[in-house]
Swiss-Prot record:
Name the record gives this protein: N-acetylmuramic acid 6-phosphate etherase
Chain ranges of the SIS domain: 57-220
The organism of origin for this protein: Photobacterium profundum (strain SS9)
Matching PANTHER family: GLUCOKINASE REGULATORY PROTEIN
Taxonomic lineage from the root: Bacteria, Pseudomonadati, Pseudomonadota, Gammaproteobacteria, Vibrionales
Listed GO MF terms: carbohydrate derivative binding; carbon-oxygen lyase activity; ether hydrolase activity
Gene3D superfamilies in UniProt: 1.10.8.1080, Glucose-6-phosphate isomerase like protein, domain 1
Role of this protein: Specifically catalyzes the cleavage of the D-lactyl ether substituent of MurNAc 6-phosphate, producing GlcNAc 6-phosphate and D-lactate. Together with AnmK, is also required for the utilization of anhydro-N-acetylmuramic acid (anhMurNAc) either imported from the medium or derived from its own cell wall murein, and thus plays a role in cell wall recycling.
Length: 301
């Protein structure tokens, strides 16, 4: 199979780094750093599309749907990284945000030969998750042409799910297939074709926004505090106390007492302190208001 990389921005040569092998270490790093500065600006231009995807994910969550990432190589690993951080940060279920990578778990640590070129594998991995119309698929590939991702996107479209993509090449097969295309154009890489660099950084910034935005919209952040964090280790036990103190301006003793009364459920402890309620009353208000602290407190007045 012949692949034409001629017109891909991510495969073009960067004039700023053409002689990078002759530079001193500090000058080499300055070139890399100067190129990295362009990434956030490229992502900024895609904020309207990112916003659309955040809203689509939020609606999917409300209906019991999931966010599924699919990618190969660096793109797949970044999706898995973002998905894996949601449960410890937001107390979400592991199956709510899932990352798929061409070649499966083996490919997380080392490349799996030809896996990314298999469209059927992309479709099969989605079928293995019982992917359906309630879910949202985000295909990730710097090139915008990875067959594994395109196969997954085609299947997602066939079941009438919302399909988005993150690519660093405009007018790609993925952007044509997606309902919503996020395309931060970061330009040529410092090392030609090494899309784990600027393209990968752009993808990570977008992924951060997608899950953070959807979790905020789902009531898992109060102010800027991660109020659904679960105390799964000593550090997080202390973080819970700190969150309750900062959210309510109460004493450490009050925070500890409230958390103990509600079995370490941070949101309940906050509502208890702010609304002066028992653990049972606070939990009921939260349940009645879909976990949103502000709405729960307002309803309790």
């Amino acid at each position: 199979m012949k692949i034409d990389l001629t017109n891909l921005i991510t495969e073009s040569r960067n004039t700023a780094s053409q002689h990078i092998d002759t530079l001193s270490t500090i000058d080499m790093l300055k070139v890399i750093n100067d190129e990295d500065k362009k990434v956030a600006l490229a992502v900024e231009k895609t904020l309207p599309e990112i916003s659309q995807v955040v809203d689509a994910i939020t609606e999917a969550f409300k209906k019991g749907g999931r966010l599924i990432y699919t990618g190969a190589g660096t793109s797949g690993r970044l999706g898995i990284l973002d998905a894996s951080e949601c449960p410890p940060t937001y107390g979400s279920k592991p199956e709510q945000v899932v990352g798929l990578i061409a070649g499966g778990h083996t490919a997380i640590l080392r490349a799996v030969e030809n896996a990314e070129d298999n469209r059927e594998l992309g479709e099969g991995d989605l079928k293995g998750l019982n992917f359906n119309e309630k879910d949202v698929l985000v295909g990730i590939a710097a090139s915008g042409r990875t067959p594994y991702v395109l196969g997954a996107m085609a299947y997602a479209k066939s079941v009438n799910a919302t399909v988005a993509c993150i690519s660093c090449n405009p007018n790609s097969p993925m952007t044509a297939a997606a309902d919503i295309s996020i395309t931060p154009v970061v330009g040529a890489e410092v090392v030609t074709g090494s899309s784990r660099m600027k393209a990968g950084t752009a993808q990570k910034l977008v992924l951060n926004m997608l899950t953070t935005g959807a979790m905020i919209r789902s009531g898992k952040v109060f102010g800027n505090l991660m109020v659904d964090v679960e105390a799964t280790n000593a550090k997080l036990v202390e973080r819970q106390k700190k969150i309750v103190i900062e959210a309510t301006d109460c004493s450490r003793e009050e925070a500890e007492s409230a958390l103990a009364a509600c079995n370490g459920h941070c949101k309940t402890a906050i509502v208890m302190v702010l609304a002066q309620l028992s653990a049972e009353e606070a939990k009921q208000l939260l349940d009645n208001n879909k976990g949103f602290i502000r709405a729960a407190i307002a309803a309790g007045k």
